[in-house]
């Protein structure tokens, strides 16, 4: 896995199912939307305009936190290194990377998580959620956009800083929660105090030049 500068910071191994072998009775919906690019850009620009904080939150092993419905049971062949009795099979009760409906199950999971925390789902973009609360006459607003296992968070609510802890208390693992500096391959230079917001893809350009030996 690479950091925001393209440097490799760690190596990962992941158990992946052979989803192309799944039968029709082992899954239902497979479609999993992500936030529109215009939604993401508008959120970031509004965050800059109203001097709000902009965060990125990344769920670790996101798909593994979703629960498979009992109406579509899935069984796995023996996994190398794991011994099962001759008359037993491995029953999959959680989401697993590679299964055809893993993305959709995770989408349902993150939707339930945000809705249960008081957020409202937008009509025009189902991957946009928002919440407003008023304390002592002051209004706080939080906007969250989902992109697979990443959350883009724009907020002026001081409680947003506790979001990582809140999600972890609900059983989710968070691998990253910090102020935005790079998102979906775009470098985002945002300084609320200096009123600065710029975008660039210098890292991507450098990668292209290196691949072309230039």
Regions found by a protein language model. Name each.
Residues 1-214:
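Long, low-complexity, charge-biased intrinsically disordered regions
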